[in-house]
Amino acid sequence: MRPEGVSRGRASSVSISMCPPPPNGARRASLGCAPPLNSRPVCCAPSSVSLSSSSSRRSMPSLGSSRSSSLPSTGSLRSITRDPERLPSRPPSYTAINPECLLERGAERPRAWTASVMTAPPSYSEALCQAPPAYELVPELSYHPTQDPRGVYSSRSDPHQTSRRRQNPICIFIIVVATMLLILGLLLTITLSSLTNGKKEK
């Protein structure tokens, strides 16, 4: 006889005893058989069935197969075939897209592509070549590793040059004042000569 009820949720073995049917014809399955209504002795010994979690799992596919057999046949669905030519073509994969072609079309390169394209430069010079324009080297401030940096920066580190730069505005001011004085002297000489010529004519 197959047991009607199985306690789920416990992995330990459970003993289920089947009691004889009562006189009204209904079955009773319990862990401990209750005495029958009539005072007759028990005619049969309780049949103990030990069920483990593995046996309950094995019984599940059989239940699933019995349920699937009750479903209607799907032979009509198998007759439907799809033409692969009518289906829309799948978009290209992420790696198949050429970022250079997209740049020519005016599209912006995503950051993921730049991260995948950029590799560690093997040397310092190539890293400088790959740098953006904002980080380009200024030839006046750069020097070769074998070159002495004091020779490169000697023109700017000269103390006399700084003093000359400070004297430049003073020299400009002196030149401007001298030109103004020359112009005033010329004007004075012209006016004085005209006055003297007018007095002589009188």
From Swiss-Prot:
Biased composition (Low complexity): 47-79
Superkingdom to which the source organism belongs: Viruses
Residues covered by region (Disordered): 1-32, 46-95
Name of the protein described by the UniProt record: Uncharacterized gene 1 protein
Organism: Equine herpesvirus 1 (strain Ab4p) (EHV-1)
